[in-house]
Amino acid sequence: MEAAGEGAPKAAALRHLADGGYAVGLLASAVLFGYAILPPSSPQARTVPTTVAAVTSTDRTIGLGKSPGPAPPSYPGLRAAPRESALPSLARTLPAERAPGGARPAPTERGRGRPALLPPLAPPAPREMPASEGVTWPERVSGRVLDPDGLPLAGASVVLAGRELRADADGAFTLTASPGSGPMIVKLPGYDRLVVAPRREPVEAVLRPRAAKAAYLTYFGVADRGIRGRVLALLTRTELNAVVIDVKGDRGWIPYRTEVPAALAAGAQGPVIIRDFEGLIADFRARGVYTIARVVTFKDNVLATARPDLAVVDTRTGKPWVDNEKLAWVDPFREEVWAYNIEIAREAARKGFDEVQFDYVRFPTDGRLGSARYAKPNSRATRLPAVAGFLERARRELGAVGVYVAADVFGYTAFNESDTDIGQRIEELAPHLDYICPMVYPSGYHVGIPGYRNPVANPYAVVHESVRLIRKRAEGTQVRVRPWLQDFRDYAFDRRVFGVAEIRAQINGSDDAGGVGWMLWNPRNDYTGEALLPKSPLAAR
């Protein structure tokens, strides 16, 4: 790598000051506006040969707020949404406002009101098979993995003592236990994980189907009791049953006291620290909530700044290259970068998450791309092995500790036969994942899809076709498709509000195409509760 020059210490100091100012600004915004942040600058358009469309926007977008607007439109594929009167009242008042009745909620951290903890409507079904105290595994452990109807689940993962094997066509397995081996974890995409305590008799592991229906909590949102309480209300009262939490956010910060040496050395301990993070995850799990750790991977301003030898380099300056948000990226070809992210994911698994989801697991799409230099030539022949190689290693290492592994991909990967110039192609990625999570926001399809030039006017069709094509291209693998859906105002076409009709159309499109659950994206964590079905024994799972 080229040296940064004599001005490097001064530049590094200025960058740290800028990061500090950015953190203070975000914290102030979170307090005053319920975590509203400004949209990123418009990226430069590029043309990708032999593809449906080039990527011209970042994969994560900013909701521009909601307003009542006109009466909701009707969309093809839109089935009856829940009546407003059938849903509980979920007031979304800003923290600074008074609660109904004029009473001000009790102050908590950063002055936010603390909502009462909301117990589940019914005790969640157990996800553990306990055993008597003092019981240990026999030397050879055998058993079967079944679904609730007693049918075998071929290919289910059985994890014991850091080793993972697959059940055979009859759902049967046999493995050797080590002295002092802890609990066994049994899992299969589309089902809840099952934790089995040591026992002497053969194991009969019955897995329950799980279609995760999630809301996203930002790096700052998860630390805010007001925001967290509103999402908890939705988890308790509506069909939501899962949550996505930033474990390494868009700037590379970690929201809890990390013990990963490389992260501490890089300064990844963020400005917000949740003291009892394990307790938070345990509380979600006690409510029957499926927990997903989001790890932003190759977009990492913290690591790139601390370790410029691992960064994408700007050929004009010899310093870390930055995108349109002035954030640096680390080099996807560097296996030390792979190890860094996997170790952070391991720590998330130890804290109790069910799944690790890698985001920005790709090459950059905006900024002066021609000035970006990598450890290897940047071409399709090199990009695909880099991204797929990272995911293969992550799935191998994290699968052996008992968590599911997922990755976020652009929605256009459903249609493009190329790698979209970012190292993402379904056929190469699917074999190394439990869940593949396309970002099928209609606003993100800036030139439409075949047959639909205006995607925001056709949310059902856009989501349905995207999920259908990805499932088709992933045939022969165990991966399940769980898309990200749009719960924010359109920013690319007519700025329409995405309300009940648009959100239900997306959900129906995913369900009808065979998606296994879905996730709602809103960077303000301000979700449209009226679009969600009320909680019921069937909707809860």
Write out the residue ranges for each language-model feature.
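Glycine-rich, aromatic-flanked loop segments that form ligand/cofactor-binding clefts
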Residues: 242-245, 273-322, 355-359
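Active-site-adjacent "subsite" loops/lids of carbohydrate-active enzymes
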Residues: 210-226, 293, 298-350, 504
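Structural motif
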Residues: 135-154
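Substrate-binding cleft of secreted/luminal carbohydrate-active enzymes
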Residues: 433-444, 456-463, 469, 476-540
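Short, acidic Ser/Thr/Gly-rich low-complexity loop/linker segments typical of extracellular
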Residues: 152-154, 162-176
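Aromatic-lined carbohydrate-recognition surfaces of secreted/lumenal glycan-active proteins
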Residues: 290-300, 357, 383-422, 463, ...
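A short, solvent-exposed loop/turn motif at the edges and junctions
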Residues: 185-196
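Extracellular beta-sheet/turn segments enriched in Thr/Pro/Gly and aliphatic residues
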Residues: 113-134, 196-213
